[in-house]
Amino acid sequence: MKIYVCLECIFIGMALMLMLFVGAAHAETASVYGGRDGYCGSRTANGERVNCSAMTAAHRRLPFGTRVRVCHSRCVTVRINDRGPWVRGRDIDLTPAAARAIGLDDTGHVTLSQL
């Protein structure tokens, strides 16, 4: 009986951890980079050039190449190819094209889910 209880606890714990790391949508604060700040054409942390018309983003922790769904008034899928943002209180930096696609002007709250 004790073994079944232990196994059940382990299973529930693993399920909760999986929900935290894969696909769980959560609120984050997004900002726009690569437009007026002069980053267009500069190198990203993974060596690519910042392409202001691409659907890419910068995130501090997600691995390069990770695809995330970002929603504001609309939703778009972006690929993480840079590190940042380095401004306190912000969680993800979007290129101008990605920000326009979701209706984000400058800085705002978005829903983020990893694909």
Where are these regions (language model features)?
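Secreted/periplasmic proteins
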Residues: K2-E8, L16-L115
